[in-house]
Amino acid sequence: PHFGMVAHAEEFSKNSDSFSLQDAVKFAKLSKDNGTWLSPTLTAMVWIANQTHSIDSIKNSPTLTYVHPLLQSKWLTANNYAKNASPANETYFDNMVQFHFQLVKEFKNAGVPIVAGTDAGVSGVVAGFSLHDELGLLVQAGLTAQEALNSATLLSAQWLGIDKQIGSI
């Protein structure tokens, strides 16, 4: 209660033992009842899950060339997601990604406002490109293309209280 926004769907998945539909519905209802918005940052969790499978997900990313060389090095050599990779972690993060998609669907069904966010800077999450990825993932999770676009424009401006000046296309 009394949180205006939860940024990162993982804040909910950390409080779920089963990643169940019932938990997704419960979290959506709790958020709706308390006026809490969601910025799921699906792209960050997808990149994290990919890295538990292989560091090649970053090495082979076409967007890596747009990242500063020092950050590239950190992502490739000091990457705890890749270093701690195991079949159990792969399964855990893959299941978490699917739960986050379910959360978005249930939050939408409950009428909870969803705003786009990316957590740019997480290994593999490249500013700019990641917003495009996030919009696509929001559609995959059940938002319409218009709802996804609104999540990055009008709803974001409403959240900031500046929708009279910006946020419309």
What spans do the regions from the language model cover?
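Active-site neighborhoods of metal-dependent hydrolases
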Residues: 15-137, 141
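Acidic, glycine-enriched loop/beta-strand segments at the rims
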Residues: 98, 126, 144-149, 157-169
